[in-house]
Amino acid sequence: MLTIAGVEFESRLFTGTGKFSSSQLMMESIKASQSQLVTVAMKRIDLKTGADDLLSPLRQAGVRLLPNTSGARNAKEAIFAAELAREMLGTQWVKLEIHPDPKYLMPDAVETLAAAKTLCERGFIVMPYVHADPVLCRRLEEVGCAAVMPLASPIGTNQGLVTEPFIKMIIEQAKVPVVIDAGIGAPSHAAHAMELGADAVLVNTAIASSASPIDMALCFKDAVDCGRRAFEAGLGRVQTQAVHTSPLTGFLQQ
């Protein structure tokens, strides 16, 4: 069972709500994934009414909402978006995203750390999206973040675990859950992340942009489950030389 800020999650697959062709398809995919934590971009919500056709079905489905600050270019904008989410959605949870460059969508480490410190002081449950930087992740943990969300590769690229060496370091040192976010493009990527010891993965593009999002959601669910079970079972040690599984010459001496 995964626990974040005192809340237990049976599913270690978190999902997003963007890029789906319809709200109905989004909901069917989320249901198939069995995800219990779903991200929602504040920029998609009508600021005048707080309405969006995805909020009602998500609430009816009983999933926990994780509003994100996507679109924020600095700490000030991210803090404003988080406060808005708390007021409009009634949640302390926030996925902190600050990426000032719209071309590459790389997270701004300096602004993210500053925003995280302020938000944690204000009582938010902060889950920051960041580079796979072990030093930064430790700093975020120290200021009170409930989890860290290092990227596997650039958002939406489906490149997989390009940052694997650094993700391993983050997992090894972390005292809070590590959720691999961004760039996971195939169920095999998700399974591998879980085999490394990640606590969860967040997937959006790979499911939403699939020819069959519902089937892909099922695949990711199974991949995450299998990857976690493999990690808990204990993977065999990687060797540089061949190691025989049984004596090679014993029968010759009989």
Curated annotation (Swiss-Prot):
GO terms for biological process: thiamine diphosphate biosynthetic process. The active site is at K95 (schiff-base intermediate with dxp). It comes from the Bacteria. 1-deoxy-D-xylulose 5-phosphate binds at G156, A182, G183, N204, T205. Keywords: Cytoplasm, Schiff base, Thiamine biosynthesis, Transferase. The keyword Hydrolase does not apply. It is an enzyme of class 2 (transferase). The keyword Repressor does not apply. Pathway: Cofactor biosynthesis; thiamine diphosphate biosynthesis. It catalyses: [ThiS sulfur-carrier protein]-C-terminal-Gly-aminoethanethioate + 2-iminoacetate + 1-deoxy-D-xylulose 5-phosphate = [ThiS sulfur-carrier protein]-C-terminal Gly-Gly + 2-[(2R,5Z)-2-carboxy-4-methylthiazol-5(2H)-ylidene]ethyl phosphate + 2 H2O + H(+). Transmembrane segments: none annotated. GO terms for molecular function: thiazole synthase activity. GO terms for cellular component: cytoplasm. Its EC number is 2.8.1.10. It is found in: Cytoplasm. Homotetramer. Forms heterodimers with either ThiH or ThiS. Catalyzes the rearrangement of 1-deoxy-D-xylulose 5-phosphate (DXP) to produce the thiazole phosphate moiety of thiamine. Sulfur is provided by the thiocarboxylate moiety of the carrier protein ThiS. In vitro, sulfur can be provided by H(2)S. HAMAP family: ThiG. Belongs to the ThiG family. This is Thiazole synthase. It comes from Shewanella sp. (strain MR-4). The lineage of its organism: Bacteria, Pseudomonadati, Pseudomonadota, Gammaproteobacteria, Alteromonadales.
